From Swiss-Prot:
Family: Belongs to the GST superfamily.
Domain GST C-terminal positions: 73-195
SUPFAM superfamilies cross-referenced by the UniProt entry: GST C-terminal domain-like
Record protein name field: Glutathione S-transferase domain-containing protein DDB_G0273153/DDB_G0273923
């Protein structure tokens, strides 16, 4: 199952950050009113001068910035942001509808391959997608590649579009899966067994 905190858990696991996830069983009016009082992206609170973040991409960047995982320069950071946004668009436009409907065809597969070819070409020019070290951009590429391949395990007639065609993306996958915490989390979440609830 891919949950709304799937990306965060992989990110925090990779960075070795301990975390506690609190989920609500229901959303009451009091909680709704509180959310409405916050800015869509970020809100400075007077009480403890903490920041409240509102969207998953923003939260991922916030975590990454605090762990030097967003690039070493403004140029690299901009590149990271660009890749993260691209991956989220692909997940929202193609991957989630495929998983939720359990329908995939040649046309959708070819569109995904076009994006994968672009990322593969970028990685063929440099070990990492943004700069000379692993960043949030690489993690997002890995997540996109991994969830796509794992879903296609149940659709063998389309898997040939991806098998052994993206060695650089495969290298990223092996890198992140070599992290024990990341590997354990992913192996315990089978996207083929339940519908996706990924919210981006």
């Amino acid at each position: 199952m891919i949950s709304s905190i799937y990306i965060f858990k992989i990110l925090l696991s990779y960075l070795g950050v301990e975390y506690e996830i609190n989920q609500l069983s229901e959303i009451n009016q009091e909680f709704t009113n509180k959310l409405e009082s916050y800015n869509q992206f970020i809100k400075h609170t007077q009480k403890d001068e903490d920041y409240l973040l509102g969207q998953s991409a923003v939260i991922s960047r916030y975590i990454s910035n605090n762990h030097n995982f967003s690039g070493k320069s403004l140029q690299e950071s901009a590149r990271v942001d660009d890749i993260v946004e691209s991956v989220l668009e692909i997940i929202e436009e193609y991957v989630l509808p495929i998983i939720n409907s359990n329908i995939i065809n040649e046309e959708i597969t070819k569109l995904l391959c076009t994006h994968f070819n672009d990322f593969e070409n970028q990685l063929s020019k440099s070990t990492f997608s943004a700069g000379d070290s692993t960043t949030l951009a690489d993690l997002y590429l890995f997540i996109l590649y991994d969830i796509t391949l794992r879903y296609l395990e149940n659709h063998g007639h389309l898997a040939h579009h991806f098998n052994e065609k993206y060695p650089h993306l495969e290298r990223l996958k092996l890198h992140f899966l070599s992290n024990k915490s990341v590997s354990e989390f992913i192996n315990s979440n089978n996207i083929n067994s339940q519908s996706s609830q990924l919210i981006i």
